[in-house]
UniProtKB/Swiss-Prot annotation:
Database matches in SUPFAM superfamilies: Mitochondrial cytochrome c oxidase subunit VIIa
Cellular-component GO terms for this entry: mitochondrial inner membrane; respiratory chain complex; respiratory chain complex IV
Record's protein name: Putative cytochrome c oxidase subunit 7A3, mitochondrial
Gene3D superfamilies to which the protein is assigned, alphabetical: Cytochrome c oxidase, subunit VIIa (4.10.91.10)
Segment annotated as transit peptide: 1-23
Keywords, in A-Z order: Membrane, Mitochondrion, Mitochondrion inner membrane, Transit peptide
Gene source species: Homo sapiens
Pfam families reported in the protein's UniProt record: COX7a
Predominant cellular place of this UniProt entry's protein: mitochondrion
Top-level taxon: Eukaryota
Family: Belongs to the cytochrome c oxidase VIIa family.
Localization per Swiss-Prot or TrEMBL: Mitochondrion inner membrane
Biological processes annotated in GO: mitochondrial electron transport, cytochrome c to oxygen; mitochondrial respirasome assembly
Length: 106
């Protein structure tokens, strides 16, 4: 039993140590030159299309999340004024609030 485990351990070491090593080109100096150029392009757009899409998605999510948080604060501030009818949105908070209001009316 112990010999089997020892043989298995040696096979595992042999396959790892004899694997071919892939050498990748170091792209850091190229990227440094690209990002340090003073060409008037904003830094967040120098990375190409992927960086531009990532920046736009981040901005949309940030602005949308901020607007949603402000909306939820308004809903929580005026529970009896009917702010939820101005901007229709079904949330867990308003669902619980409405179900509690229906129970208290009975």
């Amino acid at each position: 039993m112990l010999w089997n485990l020892l043989a298995l351990h040696q096979i595992g070491q042999r396959t790892i140590s004899t694997a071919s090593h892939r050498h990748f080109k170091n792209k850091v100096p190229e990227k440094q030159k690209l990002f340090q150029e003073d060409d008037g392009i904003p830094l967040y757009l120098k990375g190409g299309i992927a960086d531009a899409l990532l920046h736009r998605a981040t901005m949309i999510l940030t602005v949308g999340g901020t607007a949603y948080a402000i909306y939820q604060l308004a809903v929580a501030s005026f529970p009896n004024k009917g702010v939820t009818s101005i901007i229709p949105a079904i949330t867990w908070f308003t669902f619980i609030q409405l179900s509690m209001d229906q129970k208290s009316d009975k």
